[in-house]
């Protein structure tokens, strides 16, 4: 018995050392947690090893997903599961569920959410971006004006093409709030280069409070707007969100007065 106990301690210490050497802490935890179950259920050595490795892989994926979420710089954390479909008109759960499969990333396609402020466009864009991070894809989030500022800084530094190439290697860019701030001609040109450079190469998720017919106002040029829309929607799912603002639904502001109250 003493020999067996000492051997068990030696094996435990060796497993701890090996898991540290492999930088696989979840492997040690899984080996300990699953040992009794493996004995009770008469697992083969291969089954026990596979179960332990599965735990380590799952832990690494979860850790990697968290790191990608932080690197994406989302302004908040949102999920598809918590989205309130009842508040909107015409948006089908099936359409959003299909986007949640992330097939559009594999196909290097785009997603566009159109609708008035407060209808959940940014929520859905973030939720898709977070799911992409959890699935192993790199994602970068910023508003349209922030993306333009970033490209303008690169242009001033003489590094615009380097920056565009670097961004082209990111599988998913989330571009929020297209249309909230009109672009000057130079800014519109930079934004066009961003969209054009990703055409059929990588995915973009865009939100806008303006219908496509008014994008000429945003970019100051109907021709530029048409060319941009053409590249953006050629391979894209375009979803229109219709409804009152989430942010105003529990407040009196924004509500239409009744006849009784004038």
Regions found by a protein language model. Give the residues of each.
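Solvent-exposed alpha-helical segments within well-ordered globular domains of core cellular machineries
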Residues: 13-20, 29-32, 50-51, 67, ...
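AAA+ P-loop ATPase motor domain of ring mechanoenzymes
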Residues: 50-103, 107-110, 249-256
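Interdomain "pre-motor" coupling segment immediately N-terminal to P-loop NTPase/helicase cores
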Residues: 16, 20, 24-76
């Amino acid at each position: 018995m003493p020999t067996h106990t000492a051997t068990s301690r030696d094996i435990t210490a060796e497993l701890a050392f090996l898991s540290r050497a492999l930088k696989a802490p979840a492997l040690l935890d899984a080996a300990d947690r699953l040992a009794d179950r493996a004995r009770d259920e008469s697992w083969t050595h291969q089954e026990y090893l596979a179960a332990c490795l599965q735990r380590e892989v799952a832990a690494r994926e979860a850790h990697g997903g968290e790191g990608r979420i932080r690197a994406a710089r989302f302004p908040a954390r949102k999920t598809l599961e918590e989205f309130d479909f009842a508040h909107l008109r015409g948006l089908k759960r099936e359409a959003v569920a299909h986007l949640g499969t992330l097939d559009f990333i594999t196909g290097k396609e785009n997603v566009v959410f159109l609708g008035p402020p407060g209808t959940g466009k940014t929520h859905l864009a973030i939720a898709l971006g977070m799911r992409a991070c959890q699935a192993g894809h790199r994602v970068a989030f910023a508003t349209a004006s922030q993306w333009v500022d970033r490209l303008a800084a690169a242009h001033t530094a003489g590094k615009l093409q380097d920056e565009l190439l670097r961004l082209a290697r990111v599988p998913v860019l989330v571009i929020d709030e297209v249309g909230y701030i009109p672009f000057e001609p130079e800014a519109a040109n930079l934004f066009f280069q961003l969209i054009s450079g990703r055409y059929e190469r990588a995915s973009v998720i865009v939100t806008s409070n303006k219908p496509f017919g008014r994008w000429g106002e945003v970019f100051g040029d109907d021709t530029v707007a048409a060319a941009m829309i053409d590249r953006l929607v050629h391979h894209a799912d375009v979803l229109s969100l219709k409804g009152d603002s989430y942010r105003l639904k529990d407040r009196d502001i924004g509500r239409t007065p009744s006849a009784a109250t004038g």
